[in-house]
Amino acid sequence: MSGLKKYVMTYEGIKKLENELEYLKTVKRKEITEKIKVALSFGDLSENSEYDSAKNEQAFVEGRIVQLENMLKNASMVDEDEVPLDIVGIGSIVKVKDYDLDEEVEYLIVGSAEADPINNKISNESPVGKGLVGKKPGDVIEIQVPDGVSKYKILNIRR
């Protein structure tokens, strides 16, 4: 049992996965079943690209459903009321001075299952997330990233 991965997530992250799971089970499954029925009506399956496409989509969706169910079953929710304001952790919104970009950036530190770098939700397991966790306002840190070393100063922490 020790091989099971625990997914540390915020309430928002768990809700997002639950909503995706519900959509896949109630809407997407029905759509795919209908596509398969239509494709079967075309007859010969040996040269039926619609059927092959629908079956591939079905396999992908069923795989994603299993993945989401596993993630939710092994999710551990961060109590956002217990997120400290003096040290960076999962659930913290951290404002940093990025010396490379010469600008201030805000990151929400999340578990790996809900990371979304485009929206500044970075995983506690990513290089930057790992470098920020445990630090305090005023700390200046250098973090090894894939294209070198980035330097940040933690300006403030909120939730």
From Swiss-Prot:
Domain of life according to the entry: Bacteria
Biological process according to GO: DNA-templated transcription elongation; regulation of DNA-templated transcription elongation
Alphabetic keyword roster: Coiled coil, DNA-binding, Transcription, Transcription regulation
Pfam family membership, one: GreA_GreB
Gene3D superfamilies (UniProt xref): Transcription elongation factor, GreA/GreB, C-terminal domain, Transcription elongation factor, GreA/GreB, N-terminal domain
Parts forming coiled coils: 14-76
GO terms of molecular function: DNA binding; RNA polymerase binding
Statement: the UniProt record of this protein carries the keyword DNA-binding: yes
PANTHER family per UniProt: TRANSCRIPTION ELONGATION FACTOR GREA (PTHR30437:SF4)
Family to which this protein belongs: Belongs to the GreA/GreB family.
Function in brief: Necessary for efficient RNA polymerase transcription elongation past template-encoded arresting sites. The arresting sites in DNA have the property of trapping a certain fraction of elongating RNA polymerases that pass through, resulting in locked ternary complexes. Cleavage of the nascent transcript by cleavage factors such as GreA or GreB allows the resumption of elongation from the new 3'terminus. GreA releases sequences of 2 to 3 nucleotides.
Name of this chain's protein: Transcription elongation factor GreA
Source species of the chain: Clostridium kluyveri (strain ATCC 8527 / DSM 555 / NBRC 12016 / NCIMB 10680 / K1)
Protein encoded by which gene: greA
